[in-house]
């Protein structure tokens, strides 16, 4: 796991999370959960936000929203089981924060289709999911939603796996836009 970090600010804030498309498993523990618990207990962060990204999960599970809904509670319980402490970390459900959707909408006016098409992670996931030319708009634009999540919480640290690196770097670039600077 690699930590994608923005410039140092007054408050040190972590934003991380998971899509509730099933139970978390050993791969999640080794890949991110163990590190989250370590960061939570490090004392280096003023605020820690752990998002259950149900809205993002719908971008490629729109045909089965019940699967997503049923796993929200399970993911929260899995967080508690591995040692995420609600006294130290804020666990929240993405769809319960409507401002994230609103901010995503504004950001969609700043990012071009060609920029999204060039994102190597998005390209790989489109191929992996066999979307071909029938790419759902929500799926195609979810990197914009992720940028909104990051900026809304003013996250300084976004723990991300190597597969997220191109997207995290793109978010960092997007966050330097005049719109972001005005909205801070």
Model-predicted segments: where are they?
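Aromatic (phenylalanine/tyrosine) cluster motif
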Residues: 179-180
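Glycine-rich loop at the start of a catalytic domain that most often binds anionic cofactors/ligands
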Residues: 58-76, 102-108
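Short, glycine/charge-rich beta-strand/loop segments that flank catalytic centers
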Residues: 87-101, 120-129
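Acidic, His- and aromatic-enriched active-site or binding-groove loops in soluble protein domains
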Residues: 111-122
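Histidine-anchored nucleotide/phosphate-binding helix
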Residues: 26-50
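Short, conserved active-site loops that position catalytic residues or coordinate cofactors/metal ions
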Residues: 47-59
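Active-site cores that bind ATP or allylic diphosphates and position pyrophosphate for catalysis
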Residues: 123-175, 184
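Non-catalytic terminal extensions that flank enzyme cores
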Residues: 1-21, 40-46, 77, 86-89, ...
């Amino acid at each position: 796991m690699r930590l994608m970090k923005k410039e140092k600010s007054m408050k040190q804030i972590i934003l991380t999370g998971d899509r509730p498309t099933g139970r978390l498993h050993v791969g999640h523990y080794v890949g991110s959960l163990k590190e989250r618990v370590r960061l939570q207990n490090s004392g280096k962060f003023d605020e820690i936000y752990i998002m259950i990204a149900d809205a993002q999960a719908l971008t490629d599970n729109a045909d089965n929203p019940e699967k997503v809904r049923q796993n929200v509670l399970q993911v929260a319980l899995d967080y508690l089981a591995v040692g995420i402490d609600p006294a130290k970390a804020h666990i929240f459900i993405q769809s319960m924060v409507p401002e994230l959707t609103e901010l995503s909408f504004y950001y969609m006016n700043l990012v071009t289709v060609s920029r999204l098409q060039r994102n190597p992670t998005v390209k790989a996931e489109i191929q992996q999911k066999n979307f071909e030319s029938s790419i759902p708009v929500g799926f195609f634009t979810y990197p914009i939603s992720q940028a909104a999540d990051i900026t809304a919480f003013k996250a300084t640290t976004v723990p991300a796996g190597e597969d997220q690196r191109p997207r995290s770097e793109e978010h960092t670039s997007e966050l330097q836009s005049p719109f972001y600077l005005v909205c801070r």
